[in-house]
Amino acid sequence: MSSKTKSVTAVLIVLALVAGVGMTKAGSKYKTQEKVNLIFANVTSNSAKKAGEKFKELVEEYSDGDITVDLFQDNQLGDDKTAAEGVQNGDIDIAVSSSSSLSTLYKDYYIYDTPYLFLNSQEVYDVGFDGKAAQEMLKGVSKVGLKHMAMWENGFRNYTNNDHAIETPADCKGQKIRTMENPIHLKAWKSIGANPTPMAFSELFTAMQQGTVDGEENPIGIIYSNRFYEVQKYISLTQHVYTPYVVVMNPDKYDSLTDEQQKIIDKAMNCLLYTSDA
């Protein structure tokens, strides 16, 4: 074999090896994905719990079990604000939080706490979820170490109490109503003469049972799933504020996933937009 022939043969062997390595990498890009486990913190509402269960089912189905979801329902990892903070520091991968609770971390979410900003669910979906201004606003959540994933249906807030039905704002005067530590909520209730009392959600049932507060306000799904009807006589369909659930994810966790895994997570989230049983 001439030296020229040897050189050509050597080049061809090298090219074949390089091509082979390239084909192996390309061909195995998604077949050799690292298995991923996601810690998912959820709230007490039936609608969110069902959505969380469906998300787990879809993700594990789409990934053929390469992605598993550990679902912690009923605020097992803390209330929704605590869970969102857990997502910020990386202890929790995904969490569901009401926009009202999340607004303490990202103030633009306060927009959803404006009384009677939305009059029906369709307005919420068209403007509050999918509108151009809303989409721009939601991008900003990345500034506080969270990745906005989706909005889930929660519902309009309604008023319950033990004294009388509420027909006009004046009927709330003097009533001690449990609220979140939310400046917009506090100012709104004070403006109509009520006595807003910030209190942890976990303490609310006992507080109403013992008469520490006269009433509370929440979406129907939360009122029902927490059996507030056992300690409250009246419910008034005031529908004064729409409070969506916001699903957030730790951005570093999301970025650590392969493109295919990210597509699976996004697809499952998109299947659950506007999910509700209330």
Model-derived segments and their meaning:
Residues V124-K132:
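A gly/proline- and charged-residue-enriched helix-loop-helix capping module
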Residues T5-E123, V141-S276:
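N-terminal secretory/targeting leader peptides
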Residues M1-S3:
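N-terminal secretory signal peptides that target proteins for export/translocation
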